[in-house]
Amino acid sequence: MAQLVGSDEIESFRMDLAEIGRSLRSSFRGQSSSFRSNSALSASQKDDAVDEENMLAWAAIERLPTFDRLRSSLFEEINGNDANVKRKRVTDVTKLGALERHVFIEKMIKHIEHDNLQLLHKIRKRIDKVGVELPTVEVRYKNLTIEAECELVHGKPLPTLWNSLKSITMNLARLPGLQSELAKIKILNDVSGVIKPGRMTLLLGPPGCGKTSLLKALSGNLDKSLKVSGEISYNGYKLEEFVPQKTSAYVSQNDLHIPEMTVRETLDYSSRFQGVGSRAEIMTDLSRREKEAGVVPDPDIDTYMKAISIEGQKKNLQTDYILKILGLDICADTLVGDAMRRGISGGQKKRLTTGELIVGPIKALFMDEISNGLDSSTTYQIVACLQQLAHITDATILVSLLQPAPETFDLFDDIILMAEGKILYHGPRNSALEFFESCGFKCPERKGVADFLQEVTSKKDQAQYWHGTKETYKFVSVDMLSRKFKESPYRKKLNEELSVPYDNSRSHRNSITFRDYSLPKWELFRACMSREFLLMKRNSFIYIFKTVQLAIIASITMTVFLRTRMDTDLVHANYYLGALFYALIILLVDGFPELSMTITRLAVFYKQSELCFYPAWAYTIPATILKIPLSLLESVIWASMTYYVIGFSPEAGRFFRQLLLLFAVHMTSISMFRFLASVCRTIVASTAAGGLSILFVLCFSGFIIPRPSMPIWLKWGFWISPLTYGEIGLAVNEFLAPRWQKTLPTNTSIGNEVLESRGLNFDGYFYWISVCALFGFTILFNIGFTLALTFLKAPGSRAIISTDKYSQIEGSSDSIDKADAAENSKATMDSHERAGRMVLPFEPLSLVFQDVQYYVDTPAAMTELGFTQKRLQLLSDITGALRPGILTALMGVSGAGKTTLLDVLAGRKTTGYVEGEIKVGGYPKVQETFARVSGYCEQTDIHSPQITVEESVIFSAWLRLHPQIDSKTKYEFVKEVIETIELDGIKGMLVGMPGVSGLSTEQRKRLTIAVELVANPSIIFMDEPTTGLDARSAAIVMRAVKNVADTGRTIVCTIHQPSIDIFEAFDELILLKTGGRMIYWGHLGRNSCKMIEYFEGISCVPKIKNNHNPATWMLEVTSTSSEADISIDFAEVYKNSALHKNNEELVKKLSFPPAGSKDLHFPTRFSQNGWGQFKTCFWKQYWSYWRSPSYNLMRSLHMLFASLVSGLLFWDKGKKLDNQQSVFSVFGAMFTAVIFCGINNSSSVLPYVTTERSVLYRERFAGMYASWAYALAQVAIEIPYLLAQALAFTVITYPMIGYYWSAYKVFWYFYSMFCTLLYFTYLGMMLVSMTPSFPVAAILQSSFYTMFNLFAGFLMPKAQIPKWWIWFYYLTPTSWTLNGMLTSQYGDIEKEITVFQEKKTVAAFLGDYFGFHHNQLPIVAFVLIAYPLVFASLFAFFIGKLNFQRR
């Protein structure tokens, strides 16, 4: 396919259009005069009448005021009666319906590349006709250098607990000699250039060369922690002088979107936030000039231009246009989805990322690897549209691509080639080869120029391109190439341009944006409010679940604190206080899920905030306002269900005052947790902070320990705890009521006595002070939430580098390059030899599939659009075979069903309905045995983040290789695979989280392949193994894959953008079309001759051009638009072909087992025995935990903080027992420690296990281990960490509180706490295993916490719990913990104390009031260790039986 648009072609095309128009008008006049028949006359009269109507309508528009005229156009009526009559009506373009917008865009753009070109040409012609000037942006960068600070460490640069603790200590100490060693690494090194308007520039270079940093720097999105020198300017303005984020856009390589929104909604809101920019002013100027000149525009072009120029539209015609040209119209109403929620494909997400920015009015685009996951045909189509945008509208576009096909490469005007932070070439595309020929390198025939440019800088690939005749080859380093470029005429020309300052007077006034945001404040607020409301509707399940859960807890609470069982006396006053305090706990903890819900949205917020879509306040205020009705609803439910049933004071006014206070508490709670999430910004840190906050506000609320009993130096905590005011307000409201005014013998009322004993003796007006204080806290937290999002950026981590690696980087000079080059040819040969030696014993197997169909239940969105079928078919009549030693490519456009077919064949589908026959080696496929002989490289690279590359491969080898292979051979094989896939240079790196830390996209992809290859499978499925890789990395991977296939293995790969070399490395091709139908299966042949011969044999299919990539040509000629153009269904053509008949014969032959063969059978389901599985899983968990400071260090620090707070707050109260209140205080110390240290551990483990669960699903599908082995390892690795926590708690709190010293009592204290931490942690694991997502697990967890609080025996002692709930008391683990702690400490103490105005021993009081008896401690000890065993067993059961991954 030739280049679509050049400047000469544009001018020629304009002249042709004018000539065609004149000819058509002349022809029309001639033909009109020649027709004399009645029917023709009638038709002519009808057309004339319509034309006259249209002209009258346009005249009416012209008479309208300017505001209305700019919103009105002639819009073609959708008339089903007479399609030939093009009657138009005056329409307000802001009120076009969804159907009208759809029909309009379908009419304007049928064939995307051609019709989009026509549309842009017509727009430009209209603009030029009246002399309106378009804004343009020229971007210059001069001597740009970017440096990053890295922390130097000795040994492996891994974030272990020890390294993290040492770093924290050093940063806190700030002592000379203790500060971290820092090193500066150059990311970009003195680069200069000009990105010109009206030209397409391609940015090439290997991963890690600085492409992303350059794009971010030029677009003004660079991280503030990086040191930047040099100058960047737009039209002569420096970056500090305007708002670069509104003048240009950076399209990230990471696809971050809100999963609950549809594709259309994502683009609609993006369009709304970005505004219309200069379009409105251009349209106003254009309309005025046309009116003055008497020019009547094309009605369709007028409609389109007006529709996209009006600000603040909720539904925009521009969205429909972008959906169409990006091929997203077929999934416009599909949810975006995420890892756990079904949505659009990876390729569609990548296109959505592009569409999200180009839907706006931006004139300068910096696009980072926008083709990852897209087939070459789709990539070509998108880049062609971008080229048209650049050439016709004078946009400035710089695009980074990894593997551009030759046809896509030819669409660009300029090339920038980078390596190691330096620019090796920046100049015209046509001159790139000439420059490298001057350096001694020549691009071979049938080699893509882009692939050549990327490989010529590589040490291992450069030699094959050497063409110097006068001297022998010597490695030409990056520094040498950079110097040669600086001496070239291309760089000299750049220097000349940069030396001449840009004339600001030439800059269009709308080229540069000086406003931070596109919309007025009110419009920003409205847009954010409507989006937040939409997301609340989409997450309605969570809110309904929370509300129902609260109602259930309220019903339990009111039947525990039943009014018929409680009197108005001093004893029962404690129970009423307990009920009030419990209400506060419930509404406080109910806000806890706000943490996770806020955190999950932050990544998208930070992206859109950096793009200046909206300010933080526009995001936070709607989030706050829309929670008010929910908060009010939950408060009403709680108060109305519990108030009168429990038996609080019956006055209606007091009921409403309690309701108001509970509402204020709930608002404070959700505001506080939102604020903590915005400050901490990661789920682990915010969970820890949330736990500490709950601990603090409850301990200082005045209930657990009364204010008079607090140490004097800590009483300030009472006044800054929000819950204090909730406690004061509720207590004053209740105990100053008339029914509590009975006088005691001490001449004080019962109510006043109760308030005074708790330090809550305040006057009635303190209720209103409390309400105001709580709303004040709410406002304060929301202001903090806004400020945190305004000033704190997305979380990152300082890079860590070893001293050895830093020395290597600093010493990388030509001398080192020459030394490395001397070994170059030898290393290349070794690479080929290593690949060929992967010959561990295996059984060659074929895979046959016949008439495979795959259906899913029809999505609700499609049903709403009128789709009547109950099932949606994604694969239709797929028949084929995969054979040993044959490398098969599975191809098709994005969304054709490639991954779906791979999942079906591999047995990875968890939803839907599969029909048809699949056989392995001639025998029906049995998934359990098939998993042992197959490997699956998934499209999403899912790995444990806290282990190294080498450990990931070793883990796979240990569990999947045959047990008879000895350890030495396994290690050698692992080493071989690592070297073959070229991971040896990074084998000590942590895998990390995608897009956050650790490996890059291409390194992660290669690791996925290595993990599967090391299993030595007979059949390997690879889903897009080269996506995200540059040309050289893709060649490395495919060379390794080809060598594996040559050993006799069966391999099938889906592939999107193969170069000619990679495509022709395959032996066979399976090609699917949209709808999951097969249109080709057969041999490729030498130079793809068989495939080309087949398609060229079909009538109307255009012939392939010389040196054209066969893969791109094939996808282009079989695309949906091509099918429509030539009226052919390629699936039907294939079904009726001789090739199909031959293939059916082959399938029949392979469907029967070969003579003497046996069905697959293994004596055991897994390769390793149970002990081997557990040992290997435990080994992985050991390293993962040791390298997870965000998890283990945070919860350990929480334990230290909680222990210190508890020790200080209850300082030396352990032996000072005088009355019942002193016993309650000590019991409160135990209660808070048990509940909140346990809650923190349970909450902290949720995100960790959730992350590892995704890895478990992949590894379980691969048949690596039994679920129980994974679960047991996960459970066992927690024990030493929890042991250390319990020990630290005991060592700190025991002496500070001053308990009785005896080995027996100390041991019981430690044992109770250790068992508590165990069962809380295992509870968190269990909840993750039985729920689909982290937020649901967090909400369900909160209900467990509330029950553990209510039935712990602290708020309501066992003796007072109604008999219909006493079973729940015995079922609650915290009741046994507190029993063990309090009874072991005081159950044998015979000291007399005053209890409710009578004398009793401590032991007797414990027995009478709490029901705790010293002789029952052996039973308590048994029950305490039973709970962790039960929760751990349930975790193992659910993690094995349930699978929430939807595929």
Swiss-Prot record:
- Where is the chain membrane-spanning? 541-561, 575-595, 628-648, 659-679, 685-705, 712-732, 769-789, 1191-1211, 1222-1242, 1272-1292, 1306-1326, 1336-1356, 1364-1384, 1419-1439
The GO terms describing molecular function are:
ABC-type transporter activity; ATP binding; ATP hydrolysis activity
Q: Which PROSITE patterns is this protein grouped with?
A: ABC_TRANSPORTER_2
Task: Tell me which UniProt keywords the record has, alphabetically.
Answer: ATP-binding, Membrane, Nucleotide-binding, Repeat, Transmembrane, Transmembrane helix, Transport
Which residues does the annotation say bind ATP 2?
G892, V893, S894, G895, A896, G897, K898, T899
The UniProt family comment states: Belongs to the ABC transporter superfamily. ABCG family. PDR (TC 3.A.1.205) subfamily.
- Please give the name of this protein: Pleiotropic drug resistance protein 3
Recorded source organism is Nicotiana tabacum
Gene that encodes it: PDR3
